[in-house]
Amino acid sequence: MRSNVDGYGFERGEDFDYKTYEEFMAKYISILARRASKWEVLVQNKTSIVKSRKVKRFCRKGIPNGHRAMVWMCVSGADEKMKRNPDTYKKLLLSQKDQSLMDTIDLDLHRTFPENIYFSTSDGLRKPLRNVLGAVAHKNHDQGYCQGLNFIVGLLLLLIKDEEKVFWLMDTLINDLLPDYYNPDMKAVKADQELLGEIIRWKDPEVYAHIEKHSVSWCLIGIKWFICLFADVLPVETVYRIWDCLFYEGAKILYRVSAMLVIQNRDKLLACKSFTEITDVFKEIVNNPTIVDCHTFLQKCFNELGSFPIARLKKLQEECRERP
């Protein structure tokens, strides 16, 4: 009998495509088993792991759920931060709160995955969600709270039931991997939307010219992708696969995934004759059945887009950040 709730607690709607999902899982289960056996050999009961070319390759091919927390913590640097600051999270939970900040967070608690059984009631993950969001906002008081963080923390909590680890992963994302993304002016994340446009110009000039011709801004296309790190945008397992790379490599994977979402839909986009038609295609892009097959989708992101030299990306990023 088909379950109307997936393994992460998300209710499946009436339009859920069981056929596509079951076809994908029939293939993916053997891939998961193969990757799990390779990770077992690599990890061998270790409580930490060191970054290396092999670990990077393994992250790109997917981390088993049982190892994700440890690997994400280690390769991102969050584990080292937590060890250096053993009492920080506890102190933040006990400290005096900025009530207006907490009121803003409280508004988002009910909006966070209401279709998930673990977030739909007050005795589920809402309290841990509030705790982590409050601690992150108070530690980074100049940034405060940014809408979208609730979805990232929510997906982390579904996988990692340890609030403190989730807090340090968030702190590492905000301050190290994606610095300035969540500042109130959102200048950095907006600049990276322009960078996405430049990457499309570089990788597929025809699609870039067509989108520019119809005056569709890159910010309109990708702002939620980048702020939410694809949480509440793409299927959950696909998001976790993206995060396997994100915690190792930083923002570069966001550019790859975003570019692939655009370029694999080039024929639909080039057929559009207006601003509205293009934006409608982008609304549908995230529902494309090919994205359910997270393994093939990630392979395409790395194999079909060619290299993304760091020096060129940095130069393009600097140019985008200097724009008014």
Q: Which residues does each PLM region occupy?
A:
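N-terminal transition regions in large eukaryotic proteins
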Residues: 1-137, 153, 157-160, 308-324
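C-terminal regulatory/linker segments that are acidic, Ser/Thr- and Pro-rich
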Residues: 3, 17, 24, 34-37, ...
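Acidic, Ser/Thr-rich intrinsically disordered and amphipathic helical segments
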Residues: 23, 34, 38, 50-54, ...
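Short amphipathic alpha-helical segments embedded in low-complexity Lys/Glu-rich regions
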Residues: 72-77, 87-93, 170-171, 186-190, ...
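Alpha-helical cores of eukaryotic small-GTPase signaling modules
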Residues: 90-132, 166-223
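Hydrophobic residues within the alpha-helices of tandem HEAT/HEAT-like
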Residues: 153-157, 173-174, 178, 196, ...
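Alpha-helical catalytic/interaction cores of small GTPase-regulatory modules
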Residues: 159-160, 166, 221-287
